[in-house]
Amino acid sequence: MLSVIFILIALYIFAQIGGAFGNSGYRGKARMQLAEAKILVALLAKVAKSDGHVSESEAAMISEILDDLVRQMGGGEREREALKLVYKLEKENLANVRELAEKYNQTYRPSPSRKTGLIYFFLNLAYVDRGFSAAERRTISQICDGLGLPEHIQS
């Protein structure tokens, strides 16, 4: 029950920061494309698996995030399956975290507030299982580095 409440709180925070994966920053522009969503899901997978396992709470939250991303893209089951496959593959390879974040940063040039929102969301995902491991901290730090966030934001 407590984990359900925590997930609801995390999703509320997610909505309040403008939906780190949603269309915030896209007003007046095209919707998020599948290629961008794939990079974000890959980073999400690495944060979720960085402590060695994906908890039930994390899995439930990730499922809702995939649904939200598909809605934001205006996609359907095909896009959800594509994102699910990216998640499945990327959670097994924790070696390219910084490179993926750099690719996202260079390709999509997110605003500083969007970068901060993404990190805030990754932190919430990491803590949804009531723990924040050193491995999760390293993974999120690598994402910060790849996004070009200053050191003082990372600590």
Feature locations, PLM:
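Catalytic "initiation/cleavage/transfer" segments centered on a nucleophilic residue
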Residues: 51
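Small-residue-enriched hydrophobic alpha-helices in membranes
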Residues: 1-45, 56-155
